Amino acid sequence: MFGLIPASLAAASPLPALLAFSAAPLAHLRPLDIAVIAIYFGMVVWIGFYLKGKSNTSEEFFMAGREMTAWIAGLSFVSANMGSLELMGWAGSAYQYGILATHWYWVGAIPAMLFLGLVMMPFYYVCKTHSVPGYLDLRYGGHARSVAAFSFAIEMILMSGVNMFAMAVVMKVVLGWDITFSIFVSSIAVALYVGLGGLRSAIFNEVLQFVLIWGGALLVPILGLAQAGGVSGLKRQIMTNMQSMTGVSSDSYFHLWRDTSHFAANPMGVHWTGIVFGLGFVISFGYWTTDFLVVQRVLAAHNLRAARMAPIIGSFFKMAVPFIVILPGLLGLVLLQNADGSRRQLVGEDVVAACSLNSSGQVAEQGGCTAAMAKTNLSPASQQKVMAGGDDAELHSYNQALPLMMVRYLGPGLLGLGITALIAGFMSGMAGNVSAFSTVWTYDIYKPLINKNGSDSHYVMVGRMAIVVGVAVSIGAAYLVMHAHGIMDYVQALFSIFIAPLLAVILFGMFWKRATRLAGFLGLLLGIIFSAGLFMWVKLTPDALATVALSPDAKPMAENVFRALWAFIFASVLVVVISLLTKPRPVAELEGLVYGATKLPKEDPVPFYKNEYIWAVLVVIIFAALNILFW
């Protein structure tokens, strides 16, 4: 999911900037590579047709029949958050900020995933809701559900379009494919396999995507480390050349926590309080425990124990993802080279756009390019080369670190596998958002507000129609991204604005019997408005960032975590105050919805090696060890 978007992808004009490229594609596919990509497209469509017969009822179509094993649900759960947009973005962030980017995979995911599995999942699963807005309806009533449902629906369509356009742009840059061709091929494939097989088809394709991403990307860090001389060699080379690039001690690139006691002491410009409370609590818990795109995968598990185990299984793989994402970004700092053998230095998307080349290979706007490069750490020789134009004059962005490393290390067949992994990631992001949109539209908007008495087959038909409409609107969103350079910033804001108030409302609803219907509705609605107000304040008055993040040294990445923290606090205060001023529901009505008012079903005893708490403790031990190791 796109909720945890890297700053490099949410900057002023991330995706449209890539359209500025006019030079040759980064890679040329051999017949074997093309065959690998064609086989992938054939497989995903075949899966949709194969599973159509198992997706005839609403429970089968929208919830995969609740038949998924813990392993399938767990892999799908973590895979839903492994879209290529995220992988490329965080590899680029690692190039910029070093190992600090790993926080978004560890402290920004693991505690929340364990909390979902062990604490929250029993309530989601026992109440048999089809969606997170469905839980809000049961706990707070229809008004709260409607706010959540419409917010989710808009977010999912926009995110599907962003993934669609991002894939098309990457294919243009890497392979030279036409933008429109890529958009329509991907949209037709997604509409076919999700429309036919529903959530079951989306889940199985996400598991396929998980395998492809690891298979396509694993060789890059292995071969890169070998060339760099291992971890010690990588550190030594970064120490040699990073001081001149950033002005920050390159030693900071290898520490998670040591340099976070002050905003100015680390490359990311964040403080440990923002990492722990803003990212580690509000953003992380808000995404992993309330975002329907990922929660839907766990709700598809075949029983409560499987539903609890799924996020725990996913957390093991989540801790390993930095090896194929963060490490290639770090390796790119020392291994990427220009054609003349000099070190290739990546820059921001705004610089790429300002220094775009015309058809003759010359910089189109030399004045703007000069001004943009002056704000970077590009060497004078590199800047002169860009201004001179011609071969090897083209700049590449941070977000291209992973594709550039793939092109460097993957040969025929393997390059096709790597490109297929990127395509699979983008299409999985599209499919996940479209399938979630279909469920939310059908169960949380259409059924309660338009047609409450339809037959089961009618709602399946509505769900399939919603997928077609969702894909069509996503195509429009993709072209909107193409022409609206700042939309990625607003898409990220849409997500971060919504999750903090939603988390507050759900936590109070699940753990405090006194929380009332009006408190849930107003806490969510006014919390969203408050968070949006903070976003617009910083957008219109950049100096306000220092106030929101509590430091004049804060960088844009800090704004996201602190805005989420303030929005959570604001919504929490509202829920508490309004609940104390209004009448609560009778405790008898809260059965299955709130701790202290619910008797959870008894589960049969299992061997210790199948006990979810044992595995959760193991995750905590590994998580703690990793943070200490890279402190």
Describe each model-derived feature in a short phrase:
Residues 2-631:
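Membrane-embedded helix-loop-helix hairpins and adjacent transmembrane boundary segments
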